[in-house]
Amino acid sequence: MLIAAMGPKIPVPAYGVGTALFKKEKGEINRTIVDSVKNALAAGFIHIDCAEVYGNEEEVGVALKEANVPRSKLFITSKVMHNVDNIPEALNESLRKLGTDYLDLYLLHSPIPFYEKKIPISEGWKAMETALGTGLVHSVGVSNFRIPDLEELLKTSTITPRVNQIEFHPQVYKAAKPLVEFCQSKGIIVEGYGPLSPLVRDAQGPVAEFTKSLESKYHVSDTQILLKWAYSKGVIPITTTSKIERMKECLNFDSFTLDKADIDELGTLGVQHHKRTFMKHMDE
């Protein structure tokens, strides 16, 4: 299991309990979500990434309890979205649902709720800094923040976000590249969700086709190639699958070296065929 070099140790890759495992209705525990997280833990994932907005923190909590993995061995991330006007309450609710005394990483899920509710980003970040001081979270960061959003936050912050989590794959590289470079210049780790989007959502497109053409060259899967591409850019990949064999593939993505020419070609093809799946404001 790789560990990111900068800041608090962040296990790589992360298992994302996000839109693919979204809980659509409140009520009984969704065993499909529970079992997916348990399978991820059994396969070897120790970094679990979830969020308030997905409605499945309780399922993650059940999975953590049933898997019986020592809490000290895990790295748990969650995010606040709807309740940015009361972050302490949102944090306590996430902790309750997850059945844990602390989060390893807590993120502001998006800057958009601050604009919609006319709450200064600085106010939300101050609450995150306060949460860090309580010990209920061990590090704090943001998600889906653009360069202007980060600049606004950094004007008044006393603590730099440890992480900015964004959609990251070749087909958003045009918009993501300057943002990644900005974050890295400030010592902010970039995590990337949706790293397999070209394979899942544009399977006949040029990025997917080129990725698949590399399988025989490197003797690895297309999944591993795109995860490796993200990591080669200094981005921690966050991926999701319900298939145990695919989970093992993901955990073994760093077993080979991508040639620079192939890294560059994936980026070039992505820039030429831009396709964003989530958080459209990131292109604004």
UniProtKB/Swiss-Prot annotation:
Catalytic reaction annotation: indole-3-ethanol + NAD(+) = indole-3-acetaldehyde + NADH + H(+); indole-3-ethanol + NADP(+) = indole-3-acetaldehyde + NADPH + H(+)
Site (Lowers pKa of active site Tyr): 79
InterPro entries (UniProt xref): AKR, AKR3C2/3, NADP_OxRdtase_dom, NADP_OxRdtase_dom_sf
Family annotation (SUPFAM superfamilies): NAD(P)-linked oxidoreductase (SSF51430)
Enzyme Commission identifier(s): 1.1.1.190, 1.1.1.191
Keyword match NAD: yes
Superkingdom: Eukaryota
Protein residues bound to NADPH: 49, 143, 165, 196, 201, 239-243, 246
Compartments (UniProt record): Cytoplasm; Nucleus
Gene Ontology MF, one: oxidoreductase activity, acting on NAD(P)H as acceptor
Family named by the database record: Belongs to the aldo/keto reductase family.
Subunit structure: Monomer.
Protein name per UniProt: NAD/NADP-dependent indole-3-acetaldehyde reductase
Organism, as annotated: Schizosaccharomyces pombe (strain 972 / ATCC 24843)
